[in-house]
């Protein structure tokens, strides 16, 4: 923020505590299961093997947000050994993580997600993912980045055996 007074230029700084977290998740693919990514149902013959709905993008994002405040990971908060979380919509898990961040006096700043998946192509769904995640995170759509890539048919992703996702997030204490 800048202020002019009596032709003098003053610079003032707003001090906020900013923290950064990173997350990663991977899920195997199997025939006949639903594919959820970034809170959006993706038309596909395969989907994710998981205890919850398998939304690997939201899981990586949750871990990034939790990591920013050293609050563990989603496996600790929502263990796959508990029937309470069986088949749960991952958007609910994300909302719980965002609430937990708020309880610690922080809010989400921005997030960046990279999805590695050979097929289906995700480009037609990326904006919808951003628009789905933004209100849950309490940020504008332009604070949510979702990108997709392939592994050029290399590794388990390239063989269409699974999907991996990396996420980064900033949280801010005003």
Question: Which role does the model predict for each range below?
Answer:
Residues 3-4, 9-12:
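Short, positively charged and aromatic/hydrophobic N-terminal segments
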Residues 17-127, 137:
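RNase III-family endoribonuclease catalytic core
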Residues 126-130, 159:
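Short, low-complexity, polybasic intrinsically disordered segments
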Residues 133:
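Glycine-rich, mobile lid/loop segments that gate access to catalytic sites or pores
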Residues 146-150:
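Pyridoxal 5′-phosphate
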Residues 153-155:
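Mobile acidic interaction elements
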Residues 157-174:
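C-terminal edge-of-domain segments
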